[in-house]
From Swiss-Prot:
The porphobilinogen subunits are added to the dipyrromethane group. Binds 1 dipyrromethane group covalently. Its cofactor is dipyrromethane. Monomer. Pfam families: Porphobil_deam, Porphobil_deamC. NCBIfam families: hemC. It comes from Geotalea uraniireducens (strain Rf4). It comes from the Bacteria. This is Porphobilinogen deaminase. Tetrapolymerization of the monopyrrole PBG into the hydroxymethylbilane pre-uroporphyrinogen in several discrete steps. Its EC number is 2.5.1.61. SUPFAM superfamilies: Periplasmic binding protein-like II (SSF53850), Porphobilinogen deaminase (hydroxymethylbilane synthase), C-terminal domain (SSF54782). One of its GO terms (biological process) is protoporphyrinogen IX biosynthetic process. One of its GO terms (cellular component) is cytoplasm.
Length: 318
């Protein structure tokens, strides 16, 4: 391989660095002569920690500055958590690989108590409106507390903020070795994951054939079909990663089943559905399900959510 060096752009959080270092390690194993380096980049989502992400507004809160570094030529590839990646890219950039998915479920961290057994009025820490809406639909008595910070910080908020439970993505907990903290993994039909949850995406310049060829081996076809379907649904709904939209694709053989969910923030109004079809038609399936959900009430739900988001954006200086 002619490529001698490869620069990876990443956020500086503990989980982002684990993910970028995993990609670095896999590249070095495959190409022993390749010199791989990391460049840590602070994004707007990392800088604003005292405001819920839904109130910050906008898309690409954890990727924009990394993409700008790539456009400047400072980095060759970027490693992202797929759930943070917007459905549209700056001109010249694109998602070239989607890695095999880690556990896509949400996990409950509590004092050993399962979700269904938490007391009435329990205070639940979460960083996502998607989780908040789904959990309130099941348990409207609960009080949702929006928490920010890296994985370990959010785990520690169980005690620091006297919460009854904290809900986090299982993938991050497993990657960082925090599985001993988990009281329960929530089934995906109870808490549908975020779009792309558990998978990593590798972004690069679309015209850099040498880099694209070097990273091809990271792509996991079944995961890519599932995530592309989920992202097509999100794109059709014009959603960002901070709205209460969830979707989860599962591939068996050459078939893909996609489940989607749209809800009001309080979980009182929601619509859910699923479609199945050939995995190769993943994007078509995502758009079909999105249109079904929008027709069944999702359009009105999202109009209200976006109106609330716009009014909050006006209050927050960024």
């Amino acid at each position: 391989m002619a490529l001698k060096t490869l620069r990876i752009g990443t956020r500086a959080s503990q989980l982002a660095l684990w993910q970028a270092n995993w990609v670095k390690s896999e590249l070095e194993k495959r190409y022993p002569g390749l010199e791989v380096s990391l460049l840590k980049i602070k994004t707007i989502g990392d800088k604003i920690l005292d405001v819920p992400l839904a109130q910050v507004g906008g898309k690409g809160l954890f990727v924009k500055e990394i993409e700008e570094a790539m456009l400047r030529g400072d980095i060759d590839i970027a490693v992202h958590s797929m759930k943070d990646v917007p459905t549209e890219f700056p001109e010249g950039l694109g998602l070239h690989c989607i890695t095999e998915r880690e556990d896509p479920r949400d996990a409950v961290i509590s004092r050993g108590i399962k979700f269904a057994d938490l007391p009435k009025g329990a205070k639940i820490g979460t960083s996502a409106l998607r989780r908040q809406a789904q959990l309130l639909k099941i348990r409207p008595d609960m009080e949702m507390v929006i928490i920010r910070g890296n994985v370990e910080t959010r785990i520690n908020k169980l005690e620091a903020e006297n919460l009854d439970a904290v809900i986090l993505a299982a993938a991050g907990l497993k990657r960082l070795g925090f599985t001993d903290k988990v009281a329960e993994y929530l089934p995906t039909d109870l808490s549908i994951p975020a779009i792309g949850q558990g998978a990593l995406g590798i972004e690069c310049r679309l015209d850099n054939e040498e880099v694209k060829s070097a990273i091809d081996f990271f792509n996991h076809p079944a995961t890519a079909y599932a995530v592309r379907a989920e992202r097509a649904l999100l794109w059709r709904c014009e959603g960002g990663c901070q709205v209460p939209i969830a979707a989860f694709g599962e591939v068996e053989g050459d078939q893909l089943k996609l489940t989607g969910f749209i809800a009001s923030v309080d979980g009182k109004t929601s619509v859910k559905g699923s479609v199945s079809g050939p995995a190769e038609e993943c994007e078509k399936l995502g758009i079909t399900l999105a249109e079904q959900l929008l027709k069944d009430g999702g359009h009105e739900i999202l109009a209200e959510v976006y109106q609330r988001e716009v009014s909050r954006e006006k209050e927050i200086p960024v």
